Regions:
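Structural signature of multi-pass alpha-helical membrane transport proteins
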Residues: 2-12, 16-18, 22-83, 93-101, ...
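Helix-coil boundary and interhelical linker segments in multi-pass alpha-helical membrane proteins
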Residues: 44, 100-109, 193-203, 222-232, ...
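Structural signature of hydrophobic alpha-helical transmembrane segments
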Residues: 49-64, 82-86, 106-119, 143-146, ...
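Cytoplasmic-side transmembrane-helix entry/capping segments in multi-pass membrane proteins
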Residues: 77-90, 111-115, 135-146, 169-177, ...
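Helix-loop-helix hairpins and the membrane-proximal interhelical loops
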Residues: 90-136, 159-175, 179, 324
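Transmembrane alpha-helices that form the ion-translocation and gating core
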Residues: 112-146, 185-197, 314-315, 321-350
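Alpha-helical membrane segments and immediately flanking helix-loop junctions
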Residues: 136-184, 202-226
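Oxyanion-binding "anion nests"
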Residues: 221-263
Length: 350
């Protein structure tokens, strides 16, 4: 009979990580309570840190906590649930933030720019990763995070390419690079836009098409001048978020073609991708009251932040120290690539 999968805690002990459907409710409560509690605190603190989302803050807390304070063995089953089930539920609810009507207001030209940014960004980053010598899995996570929507895209891609969490260090490394490069872009994009004579909505379009995290786009849009610039920046960013669905679907099909290590075929399209698209349609064609949308946004952030914390607890800093300079070089090149494609597209259609 095959042995159950295990999870190594920071204390060096190993505890079983059952499948999400296996543990009884009482056994998952400690880990879920810990993850959700940290998520709530992250949501309260994140607004005080411009450009840093609750998701990023939660994963940092998870890494630090797991490597400084021995986590109780009782938390392992709940953390396993949080890193899988809560992650997928949060991505589904992310679809409620995207309204097709808002995206249509950008015009076909700008929507094509968004497709080009995501497509060229991902394919180009994968090629750059080969040239620089970064492992394929980490390269794919960087490509998705930098081209689509930051930490959420990294986690979604990891859920498709690493369903057993065997390479959690790659996930945390990619998120850390999103924070580093995206934070620099909060300053660089408004400054570069001013130097090039781009103002108002044009600068906002570039910010939304080039910066990694939604929170970072909001910070940059405010620095550009707020108002219309901030509005279009966020709408363009949400158009990139919508690209999460087709990209994850393509990645799922690639995984299916290559097959899993245990011989089992992964699903043709991950269920959370279908759920994400369903929520986009609900937001676009059903009159949802503002309190419902606000509640959905809060719940989505809560679930994703809890999942990020859980992912962070599985990471050992000693392994992160072995990353080396190559991923940083790839992140810089990917940022330049995405920003350049975005700028060229905006100048063509603006």
């Amino acid at each position: 009979m095959p042995s159950a999968p295990s999870r190594t805690l920071s204390s060096g002990t190993v505890s079983p990580v059952p499948s999400p459907s296996m543990p009884p409710a009482p056994s998952i409560l400690p880990g879920l309570a810990l993850a959700l509690g940290v998520a709530v605190v992250s949501m309260l603190v994140a607004p005080l840190l411009p450009g840093i989302s609750a998701l990023v803050l939660a994963i940092v807390v998870g890494v630090v906590l797991a490597n400084v304070v021995p986590l109780p063995r009782a938390a392992a089953p709940g953390l396993a649930i949080a890193s899988k089930k809560l992650l997928r539920a949060g991505i589904v609810l992310l679809g409620l933030q995207v309204a097709l009507g808002d995206l249509a207001s950008l015009g076909i030209g700008m929507l094509l720019v968004v497709v080009a940014v995501v497509g060229v960004g991902i394919l180009g980053t994968v090629q750059l990763g080969r040239l620089v010598g970064v492992g394929r899995h980490l390269t794919v996570l960087i490509a998705c995070g930098f081209s689509i929507c930051g930490a959420a895209a990294v986690a979604a891609a990891a859920g498709v390419t690493d369903p057993d969490d065997e390479r959690e260090e790659d996930t945390v490394t990619a998120v850390a690079l999103v924070v580093l490069c995206g934070s620099l872009m909060i300053v660089l994009v408004p400054a570069a836009a001013a130097l090039m004579g781009l103002h108002g909505e044009t600068a906002g379009l570039w910010a939304g098409a080039s910066i990694h995290e939604v929170a970072q786009v909001v910070a940059a849009g405010g620095a550009i001048g707020g108002g219309a610039a901030l509005t279009v920046a966020v709408i363009v960013k949400l158009a990139r978020v919508l690209m999460l669905a087709p990209v994850m679907a393509v990645m799922s099909m690639q995984q299916r073609r290559h097959g899993a290590k245990d011989g089992k075929q992964p699903p043709l399209v991950q269920l959370f991708v279908v759920g994400f698209l369903a929520m986009v349609l609900v937001r676009s064609f059903m009159p949802l009251p503002e309190p419902v949308l606000e509640a959905g946004s809060l719940l989505q952030t809560l679930l994703l932040a809890a999942a990020m914390f859980a992912l962070g607890t599985g990471v050992r800093i000693s392994l992160l120290k072995q990353v080396g300079p190559r991923p940083f070089l790839l992140a810089a090149l990917s940022t330049v690539l995405v920003a350049s494609v975005a700028l060229g597209g905006v100048l063509l259609v603006a």
